[in-house]
Each structure stands twice: as structure tokens, then as C-alpha cells.
Amino acid sequence: MSRYRGPRVKIIRRLGALPGLTSKTLKSKSNYIDRSTPNKKVSQYRIRLEEKQKLRSHYGLAERQLLKYMRIARKAKGSTGQILLQLLEMRLDNTIFRLGMSPTIPGARQLVNHRHISINNDVVDIPSYNCEPGDIITIGNKQKSRFIITKNINSFQRLKIPSHLIFDSTQLRGSVNQMINREWINLKINELLVVEYYSRQV
């Protein structure tokens, strides 16, 4: 299954707020159904499926990508669900988004693909690059790069930067000071339902 490229409003109406996909918020379709048909039962499969779709849509992943991360998380020591979230949060495209250098994760992915971003002085054009503590994230020297990201910061850096990241607005430089903790993740998600959804596939 490929990455969704349709109307974003349609997704958030069905799944709820997805800050990585869009800053827009709407009343979710699920809430409307719950109130109008209180006796209608929703299957456990559908609940797990929608939670998985929420994770995919927020981080902008294809099904095969999310399944790959799920397999890595299952092999690691610790809580599979929390490790999965940590892997997704430490992606470069998401880190750019959380630093406020882009209003959305798709926007951050475009910055990386167009070679506007460097890690430790080396240009990185892979959105899935795994950021680690000690990484320094800078903007390319091109005037266009600095203009785009400065504009984004002035317009969209309104959310609190999570504690595992630091941003120097004078140098337009971000840094990763530690791995992200569960409480700093800005998506409302029940990761255990996602783990249960994939339990027979990994």
C-alpha cells in the first residue's frame, strides 16, 4: 500500500487530529458516529486498523515502511509500542518538523529531498535517516534554503519544541541531545493497538 496523497481534510475527519499531516483540526467522523448510533458496535479489528492508519498518516509512511519499523521494534529490548514510536520520532523528516523548520512532516520531507538539510556538516537527502543524540542539523548555505526555512520558522514555530531537541534561532541550527521520551510525542495514539494489529504479521 503506497503513501496516501489525497485530501488531508478527509483523513483528519475520519481519524482525528494529525499534527504531522496538517495543522487543521476537525470534528472526527468517528465521534459523530458514536453519538448518533450509540448501540452500534465497532469491531476490535476496526479499532486497531484505524489506530494503525492514524500512525501511518501522521508520519506519512507506506504500509511496507511501517511494517519494517514494526519488525525492528519487535526485535529490540523493551516495550515494542514505545520503541516503534521512538523509531518514527527520530526520523529526520519528523525531527525537522518537531524543530519547527516545517509546518508538516510532508513539508519537512520535501526539504530533505531537495537537499536543504545537513547533518554534522554532511548533506542528507534521506527523510528516513535515523537521528541520534549528538547530531547537529543545519541548513544549506544556499540563499533559497535559508529563505524557505526562515519563513517556516517565523510562520509555524509556534508549538513547544520537545525536550530532546534544541534549536538555535540565530544560527538556524538544531541539535539532538537525547532519545525522545514517550511523553514528548505530540500525537494522540494508543501504540498497543498498533502492536496488536501487526501481531500476526511480524
From Swiss-Prot:
GO BP terms in the entry: ribosomal small subunit biogenesis; translation
InterPro entries found in the cross-reference section: Ribosomal_uS4, Ribosomal_uS4_bac-type, Ribosomal_uS4_CS, Ribosomal_uS4_N, S4_RNA-bd, S4_RNA-bd_sf
Disulfide bonds: none
Gene Ontology molecular function: rRNA binding; structural constituent of ribosome
Gene Ontology CC: one annotated term: small ribosomal subunit
Cleavable signal peptide: none
Assembly description: Part of the 30S ribosomal subunit. Contacts protein S5. The interaction surface between S4 and S5 is involved in control of translational fidelity.
HAMAP family: Ribosomal_uS4_B
Full protein name: Small ribosomal subunit protein uS4c
Organism in which the protein naturally occurs: Plagiochila adianthoides (Liverwort)
